[in-house]
From Swiss-Prot:
Belongs to the WD repeat BOP1/ERB1 family. Keywords: Nucleus, Repeat, Ribosome biogenesis, rRNA processing, WD repeat. One of its GO terms (biological process) is maturation of LSU-rRNA from tricistronic rRNA transcript (SSU-rRNA, 5.8S rRNA, LSU-rRNA). Required for maturation of ribosomal RNAs and formation of the large ribosomal subunit. This is Ribosome biogenesis protein BOP1 homolog.
Length: 793
């Protein structure tokens, strides 16, 4: 239920005529005094702090109605007809300004008329109202001062910075109004009552207002009260001037004429032309006396010259020297050096540097050999010296490296820059990449299952049949042996004239051919194992010599000659012999089984040769030598040819006959390489204990460098079906790793070392010489210097 409070305000009457001015003004004064006495308490002071009477006048004759809830909170104002204050303000905003101007003009005219007739009316009132005591008391009150009419074009506080007298309806102060977003009220009025937020319309109401209300574009919301305020024409003009970059005050003239307070033209006549005084050109008596006193002081020695004063200051300063190193107790800021960083101190000597160290600190034969082996890499040594033992201190000789170590220490002090760095507290486990557990990456070989014994010298190479039933091995004992994988039995042994450097089984399952590199000859052998139909088909293919209409150049004839094997060799299974002019080191097959390539490191620009089996002809792909070729490889999908020199790997397009890419290994010597079955990743082994993984689509530099071995890595191999690769090294270890290559090009390969298989024996610093995967099963074969071939499953 709402309460209503009605306060009637006295309206302005029509302007009185001259005849009745006195009577009308008298009656008006009496009515105003009665109304003020009704509102004010008896004896209440009507003056403000400065002693000026305050008059409360109303500018409307209408009734004011205020609404409040049961708690007394202010809700709004209504007119006499029951309409809310908001509805009345929206409809009459435009007419209020005109009404105020008319009211002001009427008030001014009525006040002027009243002043003119004031003496007459005061006399009449005094004579008529003498019997009334109440009226006499009213007349005895001090007369109220007339209100000065203010120009509406100039605000009341136009020339003042004060804001204490502003019309503030919400007393919360200058705070963010969004603090009241969750409340029903928006603040408190002067009576400490809540100001309820006005009703908010929805988007439909706002859309209708945009269409129907012509003043919608100039209506803003007051954040203090939540009411909507209509922007006047003066405010719009001010906003436009600010947006256009002009001075907000339109009465200000920024192009006023310049007033020259002092002329810029040189005047001919001086401002003052007073003749010089006589004392301006006569010697000064005071200066004469001062000079006399100074001369007397110099004679008596009381006063010193500038040179003497400078010498005394120099003597007080002392020599310009400073400490090279700071003391332990004070921190000295040296000249031209801001906050220097002290040099690191040498480590204190330990027990190993004693002239009579304990026996456990002395090197044994193995430690001495390792210490001497790191001569080229002294930073990897645990100690920069070799501990020695003496019977007494007088038996200790002079340290031969003392001067060199002092010299290197001095170089470190003045050549190596020193800086302060904030130590980062980073957990070491955070830096380690999260790798899956090896148990989740099975299957992979974990144990040694079979050992194939039969060779009497180094077994340099091993190759597996495409169906995975047999393997072939080549050794320095000049024999080629064919083994059955399941039983470990040697089925056939083929003797050769020279050391067998490399063997390779043809990857085409429709042919049964083994390429054997022995000395200067490349032998194509039919092993006569497996399917008899396949063996017979292979013999028929190799027995036919195709007709060749192409005339080979003398350069090719001098490098290679094709020939049919002798009858004695035919019995061993040799069908075709390809003679080279230099020893062959490596032989590799193309994926289709028709092409094979050989490498002769001593052949200069003819080191690499490509042979075609079906046409029995050879070709030299390179006319110039780009380095000492170590090994070659065919791309499994594209017509590309990989050539590895000592330091780099070049990829050539055989169709376009151009260089496609050059891979930078940053290694001392490349030993071998293997390509992923998909052809996008390459694995390279080096003699400097590294394995390099190249992503051919990513960069010409290694994607990852793996240092898993302690000695030279001699061979690497990818599995054809499983995401596995392996490496063999001279440390007698075969390390099996997981290498998953994803079809998503945005995802990097996953490389996880899985198992270290170390069962080979070391002979003459050689360990594992070759590794090769089973084509179907996750098994791996390794050959070593211990004359054995080992199978890990």
């Amino acid at each position: 239920m709402t309460k209503k409070l009605t306060l009637k305000r006295k309206g302005k009457e029509p302007e009185p005529t001259n005849e009745v001015a006195a009577s009308s003004e008298a009656s008006d004064n009496e009515e105003e005094e009665d109304l003020l006495q009704a509102v004010k308490d008896p004896g209440e002071d009507t003056t403000d702090d400065e002693g000026i009477d305050q008059e409360y006048q109303s500018d409307s004759s209408e009734d004011l109605e205020f609404e409040s809830d049961e708690e007394g909170n202010y809700l709004g104002r209504k007119k006499g007809d029951g309409s809310s204050e908001e509805e009345d303000d929206d409809g009459d905003e435009e007419g209020e300004e005109e009404d105020e101007e008319e009211d002001d003009s009427e008030d001014g005219e009525s006040a002027d008329d009243g002043d003119e007739e004031k003496p007459t009316t005061s006399k009449q009132n005094k004579s008529e109202d003498e019997p009334s005591s109440s009226k006499v008391s009213k007349k005895t009150q001090p007369p109220t001062k007339d209100l000065v009419k203010r120009d509406p074009s100039h605000p009341e506080y136009h020339d003042s910075d004060t804001s204490d007298e502003e019309d503030i309806r919400n007393t919360v102060g200058n705070i963010p109004m969004h603090w009241y977003d969750e409340y029903k009220h928006i603040g408190y009025d002067w009576d400490a009552k809540k100001i309820v937020k006005p009703p908010q319309g929805d988007q439909i109401d706002e859309f209708l207002r945009k269409i129907e209300d012509p003043n919608f574009w100039r209506t803003v919301k007051d954040p203090q009260t939540g009411q909507e305020v209509l922007i006047t024409d003066e405010d719009i003009a001010l906003i436009k001037r600010i947006i256009s970059g002009r001075i907000p005050n339109k009465d200000h003239n920024e192009y006023e004429p310049w007033v020259e307070w002092f002329t810029s033209e040189v005047e001919k006549m001086p401002i003052k032309n007073v003749p010089d005084h006589k004392r301006s050109f006569l010697p000064s008596v005071s200066e004469k006396k001062r000079v006399g006193r100074m001369v007397h002081a110099l004679k008596m020695g009381w006063m010193k010259t500038t040179e003497e004063v400078e010498r005394e200051k120099q003597a007080k300063r002392g020599p310009k020297f400073y400490m090279l190193w700071e003391t332990d107790t004070s921190r000295e800021h040296m000249r031209r050096i801001h906050d220097p960083v002290s040099a690191p101190k040498r480590d204190l000597p330990g027990h190993a540097e004693s002239y009579n160290p304990p026996p456990e600190y002395l090197f044994d034969e193995r430690e001495t050999k390792e210490w001497l082996k790191l001569k080229d890499e002294p930073h990897k040594r645990k100690l920069h010296f070799m501990p020695q033992k003496f019977t007494s201190l007088r038996a200790v000789p002079a340290y031969s490296r003392y001067l060199r170590e002092r010299f290197l220490r001095c170089l470190d002090l003045y050549l190596c820059p020193r800086a302060k760095r904030v130590k980062l507290n980073i957990d070491a486990e955070y830096l380690i990449p999260k790798l899956p557990s090896p148990r989740d990456l099975q299957p992979f070989p974990t144990i040694e299952s079979l050992v194939y014994r039969g060779h009497t010298d180094l077994v340099r190479s091993v190759s597996v049949e495409p169906k995975g039933e047999y393997i072939v091995s080549g050794s320095d004992d000049k024999t080629v042996k064919i083994w059955e994988i399941a039983t470990g039995r040697c089925i056939r042994t083929i003797e050769t004239e020279d050391v067998v450097r490399c063997v390779a089984w043809c990857p085409n399952a429709k042919l049964s051919i083994i390429a054997v590199a022995t000395g200067n000859r490349l032998l194509l052998i039919n092993p006569k194992v497996g399917d008899k139909v396949l063996v017979k088909k292979t013999d028929d293919l190799l027995a036919e010599e195709p007709s060749s209409d192409v005339i080979e150049s003398e350069r090719i004839k001098a490098a290679v000659q094709w020939a049919t094997a002798e009858p004695a060799e035919q019995e061993k299974g040799v069908r075709v012999v390809i003679n080279h002019f230099k020893p062959i080191r490596q032989v590799t097959w193309h994926g289709r089984g028709d092409y094979l390539a050989t490498v002769m490191p001593e052949g200069a620009n003819r080191s690499a040769l490509i042979h075609q089996l079906s046409k029995r002809r050879s070709q030299i792909p390179f006319s110039k030598s780009k380095g000492l070729i170590q090994c070659v490889l065919f791309h499994p999908v594209k017509p590309c040819f990989f050539v590895a020199t000592q330091h780099n790997i070049r990829i050539y397009d055989l169709v376009k006959q151009e260089l496609v890419k050059k891979l930078l290994t940053n290694s001392k010597w490349i030993s071998g390489m293997s390509i992923h079955p998909k052809g996008d990743n390459l694995l390279v082994s080096t003699y400097d204990k590294k394995m390099l993984w190249f992503d051919l689509d990513l960069s010409t530099k290694p994607y990852q460098t793996m240092r898993l071995h302690r000695n030279a890595v001699r061979s690497v191999a990818f599995h054809l079906r499983y995401p596995l690769f392996a490496s063999g090294s001279d440390d007698q270890a075969v390390i099996v790793s997981h290498g998953m290559v994803y079809n998503d090009l945005l995802q990097n390969p996953l490389i996880v070392p899985l198992k270290k298989l170390q069962t080979h024996e070391k002979r003459e610093d050689f360990g594992v010489l070759d590794v090769n995967w089973h084509p179907i099963q996750p098994w791996i074969f390794s050959t070593g210097a211990d004359c054995t071939i080992r199978l890990y499953t």
